[in-house]
Design a protein with these regions (language model features):
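N-terminal secretory signal peptides that target proteins for export/translocation
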Residues: 1-8
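Short non-domain terminal segments
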Residues: 9-13, 127
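Bacterial N-terminal signal peptides
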Residues: 12-23
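Soluble, non-membrane globular domain cores that form compact, hydrophobic packing
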Residues: 23-311
Length: 311
C-alpha cells in the first residue's frame, strides 16, 4: 500500500505532462508549418481570406519569383502563406509568410538580409523589426514576413497582433544563434551582423560565414568569422585566400605559427585586409586603413574563440 501511494501520483504527473505536450502544437512532434498561421483570424475584424497555401523548393518561385534563389542556400524546406483581410475594409489585407529553414542560424541568415541597423526593433521571437508597411522576425528555425496589401502603410499594433499570434504557434527556440557570440566585441556595430550561407565576400573558398560592421578609434571596417569543422579545413581555407592574394593582391606579409597564421595585404576588392587562421576558425577584417586597430580587433576575436573553446 505504501508503495502504490507514491507510484500513482508519479504516473499521474507524467500522464498530465504528456497530454499537455501533445495538446500544444508547439511542443508536439512533427509541427506542421500550416498550423503556424492563424486558421480564422488574429484580431477583431481581421479574418483569413482563403485557406493557408503551402510551397516547397519546387514551387516557391510561384510565390516569390524574384527572391526564391536567395532562400535555397539557407536550407529552405517549406513555406506557408495566408492573407488576412479587414472586414470593415476588404481592400486592406496583411500577407503573412512563414518560411522553415534548416536551422536557427539559417533563419537568422535570411532575416539578416533584410534588416538594417536603423530599423525600429520589436520584441518578437529572437529578434524582429517593423516599419509602416511590413514586419519581420525570426524564431527557432522559422523566418516570418508580414506585409500590408491594398495600402502603403498599416498601424504598428496590427502588425504586432498578427506577429504575436504566429510567434505563439512556433517553437520557442533558444534565442539568437550561438555562432554570433564570437563577433560580440566592443567595436561591433549592433545589429549589423549578417550570415552568408555561401561565398562570403564573394569568394568561393570562403564557403560561408558571418560578417559585421565594426568601429573603433575613429576607424571603420568589417570583421568576419568563418567556422570550419576542423583546424585542417580552416588552414586550407586560409591557404586558398593567401594564394589568391599572392596572385592578385599587394603588400603581403605573413606571420604566425601552424595553429595561428596571419596575413596582412591589400585585397583588390576590399582594400586593406588582415586575416587569421585561429584553430578551426578563419577570422579577419577588411576595408582596413589602420592595421594596428585591425590587429586589436582580431586579437579580441581570437580571445573570444579561445574562451569559447575553453583554452
Amino acid at each position: 500500500m505504501h508503495k502504490n501511494s507514491h507510484t500513482r501520483p508519479s504516473f499521474l504527473f507524467i500522464f498530465l505532462i504528456i497530454i499537455m505536450a501533445l495538446s500544444n502544437p508547439v511542443h508536439a512532434a512533427g509541427l506542421s508549418i500550416k498550423d503556424v498561421l492563424p486558421g480564422k483570424g488574429f484580431a477583431e475584424n481581421w479574418v483569413i481570406e482563403e485557406k493557408v497555401q503551402l510551397y516547397d523548393k519546387d514551387t516557391l518561385f510561384d510565390h516569390i519569383d524574384g527572391e526564391a534563389e536567395l532562400y535555397f542556400p539557407y536550407g529552405f524546406d517549406a513555406m506557408a502563406t495566408a492573407s488576412y483581410v479587414n472586414k470593415q475594409n476588404p481592400d486592406l489585407s496583411i500577407v503573412a509568410d512563414v518560411y522553415r529553414m534548416a536551422s536557427v542560424l539559417d533563419a537568422f541568415g535570411i532575416y539578416s538580409n533584410y534588416r538594417k541597423t536603423n530599423n525600429l526593433w520589436v520584441a518578437i521571437g529572437a529578434e524582429g523589426f517593423v516599419s509602416s508597411s511590413q514586419l519581420m522576425f525570426y524564431q527557432d528555425r522559422y523566418f516570418v514576413r508580414l506585409q500590408v496589401a491594398g495600402a502603403t502603410s498599416l498601424e504598428k499594433d496590427i502588425f504586432l497582433a498578427c506577429a504575436r499570434t504566429i510567434s505563439g504557434n512556433l517553437p520557442a527556440g533558444s534565442g539568437q544563434p550561438k555562432e554570433l557570440e564570437i563577433l560580440k566585441i566592443p567595436a561591433l556595430v549592433p545589429k549589423s551582423e549578417r550570415y552568408l550561407a555561401q561565398s562570403l565576400l564573394g569568394y568561393v573558398f570562403f564557403r560561408k560565414g558571418i560578417i559585421a560592421d565594426a568601429a573603433a578609434q575613429d576607424e571603420k571596417m568589417q570583421i568576419f568569422v568563418i567556422h570550419e569543422d576542423t583546424q585542417a579545413a580552416a588552414r586550407k581555407t586560409f591557404d586558398q585566400y593567401h594564394s589568391y592574394l599572392k596572385a592578385e593582391g599587394q603588400g603581403i606579409q605573413m606571420t604566425g605559427n601552424p595553429a595561428r597564421m596571419q596575413v596582412i595585404a591589400v585585397d583588390p576588392l576590399y582594400g586593406g585586409v588582415l586575416v587569421e587562421q585561429s584553430g578551426r576558425y578563419v577570422i579577419g577584417a577588411v576595408r582596413v586603413k589602420n592595421t594596428s586597430v585591425a590587429k586589436q580587433l582580431i586579437d579580441e576575436l581570437h580571445g573570444r574563440i579561445s574562451a569559447d573553446a575553453g583554452q
